[in-house]
């Protein structure tokens, strides 16, 4: 699948996904300044299938009904906190289907 990382998603996570997915960062596309709705629009238009984000409020800020892109929300943005939960993150990305939403709980500290 074609996976997009938003600005808060640690790039180190990509190495755990690249064997099955193509991963691109929003900043690599020049999308680092886009707000959530516009980022979702651009990502869908470009053919991205999954957005990995650290924005836990995304589902409350955007109407996700009818979206083709799947969204995986990480509970934290710091790699040191995500790393012990990388298996769950990879599983959530692998299980993503068009329009799906998943949140991977990552406790702080």
Where would I find each of the regions flagged by the language model?
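N-terminal first-folded block
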Residues: 1-49
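Alpha-helix N-cap/helix-start and coil->helix boundary motif
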Residues: 10-11, 57-58, 79
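Short glycine-/acidic-enriched loop or helix-start segments at secondary-structure transitions
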Residues: 14-15, 61-63, 83
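Short beta->alpha connector loops at strand-helix junctions that form conserved
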Residues: 27, 54, 74-76
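Generic secondary-structure boundary/loop-capping signal
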Residues: 28-31, 57, 61, 71, ...
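Glycine-rich loop at the start of a catalytic domain that most often binds anionic cofactors/ligands
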Residues: 64-68
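C-terminal structural segments of small proteins and small subunits
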Residues: 69-109
């Amino acid at each position: 699948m074609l996976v997009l990382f938003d600005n808060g998603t640690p790039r180190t996570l990509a190495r755990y996904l690249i064997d099955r997915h193509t991963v691109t960062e929003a900043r690599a596309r020049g999308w680092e300044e886009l707000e959530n709705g516009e980022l979702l629009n651009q990502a869908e238009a470009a053919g991205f299938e999954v957005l990995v984000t650290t924005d836990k409020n995304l589902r409350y800020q955007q109407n996700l009904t009818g979206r083709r892109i799947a969204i995986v929300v990480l509970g934290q943005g710091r790699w040191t906190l995500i790393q012990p939960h990388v298996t769950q993150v990879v599983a959530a990305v692998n299980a993503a289907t068009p329009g799906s939403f998943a949140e991977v709980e990552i406790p702080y500290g």
